[in-house]
Amino acid sequence: MPPPRKRGRGSFRGSSRGAHRGRGHARGGRNSFQTSRVDEKREIESSDDEEQFNGFEDEVSGGEEPMQDVEIASEPSSEDEEPATERSYNSLLQLLNAKSEPSHARKRRKLDHLESKQDKPNREVEIQETTKEPEEQDVLENQEASEEEDNVEVDRAGESDDEDEEDASDPFETHISSPDETEISKRVKEITAGKWRSIKSSLLETFRLIYNIPDEEGGSWSIPSAVKNTRSLKLKKRLIPTAAERIPSFSGISQNIASLVFNYSDVLFGDRKASNAAQLRDLLSLHALNHVLKTRDRVIKNNARLSRDINPDIELRDQGFTRPKVLIILPTRQACVRFIDSISRLYQPEQQENRKRFMDEYNAKDNESWESKPDDFRDLFGGNDDDMFRIGLKFTRKTIKYYSQFYNSDIILASPLGLRTIMDKEDEKKRDHDFLSSIEIAIVDHADGLLMQNWEHVEYIFEHLNLQPKEAHGCDFSRVRTWYLDDRARYIRQTIVTTSFLTPEMNSLFSQHMQNVAGKAKILPQYNGAITEVALPITVKQTFSRFDSTFALKEPDLRFKYFTTAILPALARSVTGKGEGNGAGTLIFIPSYLDFVRVRNFFSTSSRATNISFGAISEYTEQSEMSRSRSHFMSGRLSVLLYTERAHHFRRYNIRGVKHVIFYGLPENPIFFREVVQYLGLDPGALAGSAGAETLDVRAVFSKYDAFKLERIVGTQRAANMLKEKGGDTFRFV
């Protein structure tokens, strides 16, 4: 199998960019607690038991000992400075007063002492680091869930102006809170049997919808109607004004996406762009926030009801096994900043705890040298492109709390790598994924960016969503919803995936892990083809060659055989020839790293490639070697340059000296096809004169397993004909 796809651009810019932001050593200057007594204290004290004091506990300096008794609580100075007689006297007082003063009073006195040092209306608490990684410390310590902070608000339930009446037509009620158990059982049986019925429809802007429903018998199903603005949605009262301001209206395909999302259907959207990313982000943030607030308010109201009702038989099921309800998977820290900014603008809290720390560790300015880079590149890699992160958000009536421990969080935002590192530890006893047991909305944004990292991490996370927890974590099972207890949470969970293009990996995720009883929708565009968008001052002959492959497992071997027998001989003859028509300046674009290694080794060892001078650039090539290969290729010292798709994804080089392009395989991203073909226009000498222009050409190799790629490059209609054509296997475009 290929080497693991490392963190985003970490293999290229980890030393230059990662060292001063993200998870680098920028935070290493903080003092660390070195005593075992601190760990003991953190074990005893749950983070949420006294959340109002949490910030002050975290700001205790490394030189202060955690209080263990009355003496330390009342006298924060060092014990070594006290006379022995005074210590004995205080010890006697401690014994005499042991029964008269409860333990929590000692803790409160200590915290009150610290509060006198901090008097800020909007406190931004910095968490002290231990010897553990700071994110690990934040997310996994004090796992016992606590509802004490919610209980503090029980008395306020019903007093706020933003209280909502329960609406039986609200999808939150029909899908999450009070679903029809009989109907759920029926649909789950259909799903487990693989009985999906597809409804296909054409949408606005040449989009097509494939809506799969778990109903083979042909019941009364209809595609949710498009919505034009947020007034048509069932929103929390407090979100209505901010939603109207932030999202005045839904335009184009967003109208259909919004109706499906707020109907709790699964959605796979295959046309995410830099131009529509912000509106999609606001839409998904609004939905996630609306869901969290409705869930938490229902719990608080029922807490108040239980505190007043003396009936012991009352049953209120309003919770999952653990608190986190929304999981948002993102490619980079900067993407996390954008998502959280969208959430905070919609929520408009009075306080944001740890906001400063969050911005220091996650936010960064764009690289000024990237102004010439494409929009999609700057959208993905702009700012802090570190892909190792995880953070929890907790919501109260007036506050957003950053870096809340996962078991006390409402929303978890993480990269696949950041989340897997705490789920899949070497020590099995330390592995933990119970915090994913009650996820009700899973959002994967910019999935095509995650594909270039390591898609296996995404699959691993989805395999561990909504599993029965191994421990109780303070769960009140009398409040757990029935469909959780019946192990049907995966069929209730809503999954939303946005991507710039569809791949087999994402299609597999759609088939295997998107199992929603409310149905699942795939929204894809009609493609005109990247070949129509190539900007060259001259026309270039483009030839597409199809080779037959019966089995997917044999496809790499058959592709290599086709390349070495049908393409390489002509290339070997041309590079040794003279004149303008020789094969010098041939760039071979290879999507797969495994195929790249195979072709590189062939050029190095095969007698058939002895006379071909070549260079190679992959995602793992050192910067100096990259520069040398590009320079020698441009000057003609190298006749052939091997170039991988992931190298282009992370670098977006403009390679000069290209006269011939061979696509060993089609790129996943259609933008890459256009950009690589446009290399032919970077050499003015090659364009001079009609004879020189006629020597420029493009050749691409494909099989039936490249259907998605081919559709994006030649267009939806052309691709269908090229895959079905029986009269020939060569197709030329000019």
Swiss-Prot record:
Family matches, as InterPro entries: P-loop_NTPase, UTP25, UTP25_C, UTP25_NTPase-like
GO cellular component term, pick one: small-subunit processome
Subcellular location(s) of the protein: Nucleus, Nucleolus
Superkingdom per UniProt: Eukaryota
Annotated Basic and acidic residues bias: 112-134
GO molecular function: rRNA binding; U3 snoRNA binding
Region (Disordered): 1-186
Known role: DEAD-box RNA helicase-like protein required for pre-18S rRNA processing, specifically at sites A0, A1, and A2.
UniProt name for this protein: U3 small nucleolar RNA-associated protein 25
Lineage: Eukaryota, Fungi, Dikarya, Ascomycota, Pezizomycotina
